[in-house]
């Protein structure tokens, strides 16, 4: 992107979500600006968690600011517009992103990186007893509530980590 008034905006690239991929895109365009390309980041979270540090954060090795990335300086470095909003709709006929409380945002190119959400609807009891790690921001809120509940209780507490990948093992070790 180039904010010079001599170079008009020719194309709009809109990034929805501040996940890993879009952080890399912002960094790339900050270091390799494209004249006439306007970048826009739409994100519901201005501080996005870095998932690789999640087990260390849960274990108490990192503070919030160490395990999260503030997207505002990164967007500024890339000369990107940043909107703190949640996308409610995409209008492909008019090439607009719709967010509550703001005018439509035009795009020529769009990239969506909003993270995953595990499907727990069809697992009996999951809504009452499971804490999916994704989306991470919701997990962290639930985790803090769980830690408070355990700390205030005199009863034994049993925790099961479901998932045998490297992330599951790291989370199991971090919760000890």
What are these regions (language model features)?
Residues 2-81, 159, 170-176:
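Beta1-alpha1 glycine-rich phosphate/pyrophosphate-binding loop at the start
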């Amino acid at each position: 992107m180039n904010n010079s008034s001599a170079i008009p905006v020719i194309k709009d690239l809109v990034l929805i979500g501040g996940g890993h991929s879009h952080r890399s895109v912002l960094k790339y365009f900050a270091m390799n600006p494209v004249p006439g390309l306007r970048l826009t980041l739409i994100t519901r979270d201005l501080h996005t968690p870095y998932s690789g540090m999640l087990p260390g954060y849960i274990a108490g090795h990192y503070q919030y600011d160490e395990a999260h990335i503030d997207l505002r300086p990164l967007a500024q470095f890339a000369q990107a517009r940043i909107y703190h909003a949640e996308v409610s709709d995409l209008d492909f006929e008019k090439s607009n992103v719709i967010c509550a409380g703001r005018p439509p945002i035009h795009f020529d190119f769009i990239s969506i990186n909003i993270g995953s959400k595990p499907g727990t609807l069809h697992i009996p009891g999951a809504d009452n007893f499971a804490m999916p790690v994704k989306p991470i921001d919701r997990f962290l809120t639930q985790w803090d509530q769980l830690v408070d509940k355990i700390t205030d209780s005199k009863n034994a507490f049993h925790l099961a980590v479901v998932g045998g990948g490297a992330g599951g093992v790291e989370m199991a070790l971090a919760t000890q």
